[in-house]
A protein has these predicted regions:
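Catalytic beta-strand-to-alpha-helix segment of the class III nucleotidyl cyclase homology domain
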Residues: 44, 48, 68-179
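Catalytic NTP-binding/metal-coordinating core of nucleotidyl cyclase/transferase enzymes
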Residues: 2-80, 84
Length: 180
């Protein structure tokens, strides 16, 4: 067994924002590149992203047609970041994204290129939450919504959607995060 496998897995809670460009695979390669560039710019310009990155409390994972952003401090961070990105993308109607947010266990791993990466249920469930979304939606796991509902600032924007069947016939409870 390799030495890395014997090392104790250090689990942490990650607050994950998963973002996907809707219809990406149907686009021409040039369009894919252009839209991914616009999305990357919007993400890098988001204040919550820049703040967490400057503090060394953010991990970025490209997914080909989007990304996962793993914040380390608070479930509010991915929500604020999603709002900032959504606002920035209003200027680009051709770029339709969907977003999913979940807080859960994650652990750092080395990827095939031996670079730091992150894995775990926190990432997986955030992606499943996002998979339930349509273009323009920001969906939260029920877990994140329950954390946020204790704050007056967030409560008016939380709208229970119910349950969604995702990969492996798993059922998850989701909440739509909606502002005007």
């Amino acid at each position: 067994m390799p030495a890395e496998s014997k090392a104790a897995v250090r689990l942490a809670i990650g607050h994950v924002l998963f973002i996907d460009i809707v219809g990406y695979s149907r686009l021409m390669i040039g369009e894919q590149s252009d839209l991914l560039g616009v999305l990357n710019d919007a993400v890098r310009e988001a204040g919550e992203f820049r703040s967490a990155e400057a503090d060394g409390r953010l991990m970025r994972l490209p997914t080909g047609d989007g990304m996962a952003l793993v914040f380390r401090d608070s479930p509010e961070q991915p929500v604020r970041c999603a709002l900032e990105i959504s606002q920035a993308l209003k200027n680009y109607p051709k770029l339709q994204v969907r977003m999913g947010i979940h807080s859960g266990p994650v652990n750092e791993v080395a990827d095939v290129n031996e670079r730091a990466n992150i894995a775990g249920a926190g990432i997986n469930i955030a992606q499943r939450v996002m998979d339930c979304a349509d273009a323009g939606h920001i969906l939260l796991s029920k877990h994140v919504a329950e954390d946020l509902q204790h704050y007056l600032e967030w409560r008016p924007y939380l709208h229970d959607v119910g349950q969604c069947e995702v990969k492996h016939e798993e059922i998850i409870s989701i909440v739509n995060f909606y502002t005007k």
